[in-house]
């Protein structure tokens, strides 16, 4: 099969004449993916935009809302995370929220224009009992609002994945963060294989996967692309691929990480779009640090979802009024 990044002129002509030409692949190699990532930026964005328009409505953007339903005290030692109990961070720990309160906030998010409601709990893994039952109630309540429901709860077993599916869960977020070679530099309390096994259990239960990563962790471009190769090797591809920029937080090991050129997130989004053309590519954490122009480049390169709201778990997000003005200026519909 001819790849998006290396197809011949005849292959490109055929694709342009026939929008239904299949370009979805699961056999990406690291070297060819790196070659795509390192294309001249304008060529990379142009190719990604062409694929984006072939598979998606370029005039539509999904708004998602994200809520921390249980904050702080996580036993994992992820180097970027303010919620880890291993780090000396000024953060107020909060117990699991009441389902009624969560569903009420979901209703407000829907009224503000959000289509998907995401809920995050700072757990290593799900434990059966009252708290998990409460999360299932939250999911059912969000779905009753005719919203998509996504949760991130840590590791799950097969039975828990089944119960999440029965509650109507739309998607489960479990990020790979970076490539497998660099992953041990970020966290030591679980392995890359642990992440992949949880994703497999979620997929086996029939729940859509939301899994992506973070740039700015001290990784190399090769590490970033290595993660994309892992994701693009999943058949089918993840339904959602969030792309985050590190938000340095005082007290975490990565508080003083060197900043990344914002155009690197544009490259990441464009490469993800080319490698996983049918997936939702979500411009996620760190967006508040990007200029208006860089955000527009991300959308042109293939991002078709943003988080809408002033806070993402424990980090700031882009201003809602500024988002409204940006979307109006672009002339895109968002929900």
Curated annotation (Swiss-Prot):
It holds the Pfam family Radical_SAM. Binds 1 [4Fe-4S] cluster. The cluster is coordinated with 3 cysteines and an exchangeable S-adenosyl-L-methionine. Binds 1 [2Fe-2S] cluster. The cluster is coordinated with 3 cysteines and 1 arginine. GO terms for biological process: biotin biosynthetic process. It comes from the Bacteria. It catalyses: (4R,5S)-dethiobiotin + (sulfur carrier)-SH + 2 reduced [2Fe-2S]-[ferredoxin] + 2 S-adenosyl-L-methionine = (sulfur carrier)-H + biotin + 2 5'-deoxyadenosine + 2 L-methionine + 2 oxidized [2Fe-2S]-[ferredoxin]. Gene3D superfamilies: Aldolase class I (3.20.20.70). Its cofactor is [4Fe-4S] cluster; [2Fe-2S] cluster. The keyword Iron applies. Pathway: Cofactor biosynthesis; biotin biosynthesis; biotin from 7,8-diaminononanoate: step 2/2. Residues 1-20 are annotated as: Disordered. [2Fe-2S] cluster binds at residues 118, 150, 210, 282. The keyword Manganese does not apply. Its EC number is 2.8.1.6. [4Fe-4S] cluster binds at residues 74, 78, 81. GO terms for molecular function: 2 iron, 2 sulfur cluster binding; 4 iron, 4 sulfur cluster binding; biotin synthase activity; iron ion binding. It is an enzyme of class 2 (transferase). Homodimer. Belongs to the radical SAM superfamily. Biotin synthase family. Catalyzes the conversion of dethiobiotin (DTB) to biotin by the insertion of a sulfur atom into dethiobiotin via a radical-based mechanism. This is Biotin synthase. It comes from Zymomonas mobilis subsp. mobilis (strain ATCC 31821 / ZM4 / CP4). The gene is bioB.
């Amino acid at each position: 099969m001819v790849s998006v990044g290396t197809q011949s002129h005849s292959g490109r002509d055929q694709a342009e004449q026939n929008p239904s030409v299949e370009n979805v692949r699961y056999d990406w190699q690291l070297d060819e993916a790196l070659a795509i990532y390192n294309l001249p930026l304008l060529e990379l964005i142009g190719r990604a935009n062409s694929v984006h328009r072939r598979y998606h409505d370029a005039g539509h953007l999904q708004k998602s809302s994200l809520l921390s339903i249980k904050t702080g005290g996580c036993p994992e030692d992820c180097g970027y995370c303010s919620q880890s109990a291993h780090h000396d961070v000024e953060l107020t720990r909060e117990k699991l929220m009441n389902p009624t309160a969560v569903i009420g906030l979901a209703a407000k998010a829907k009224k503000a224009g959000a289509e998907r409601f995401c809920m995050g709990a700072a757990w290593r893994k799900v434990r059966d009992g009252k708290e998990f039952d409460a999360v299932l109630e939250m999911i059912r309540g969000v779905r009753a609002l005719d919203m998509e429901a996504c949760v991130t709860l840590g590791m799950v077993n097969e039975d828990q994945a089944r119960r999440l599916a029965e509650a109507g869960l739309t998607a489960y977020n479990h990020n790979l963060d970076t490539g497998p070679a660099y992953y041990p530099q970020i966290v030591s309390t679980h392995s890359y294989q642990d992440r992949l096994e949880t994703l497999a259990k979620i997929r086996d239960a029939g729940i859509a996967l939301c899994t992506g990563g973070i740039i700015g962790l001290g990784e190399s471009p090769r590490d970033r692309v290595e993660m994309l190769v892992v994701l693009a090797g999943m058949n089918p591809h993840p339904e959602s691929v969030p792309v985050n920029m590190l938000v340095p937080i005082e007290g975490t090991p990565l508080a003083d990480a060197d900043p990344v050129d914002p155009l690197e997130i544009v490259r990441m989004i464009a490469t993800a779009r080319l490698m996983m053309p049918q997936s939702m590519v979500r411009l996620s954490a760190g967006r508040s640090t990007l200029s208006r122009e860089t955000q527009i480049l991300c959308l042109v390169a293939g991002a078709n979802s943003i988080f809408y709201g002033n806070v993402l778990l424990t980090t700031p997000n882009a201003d809602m009024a500024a988002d409204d003005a940006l979307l109006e200026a672009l002339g895109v519909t968002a929900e």
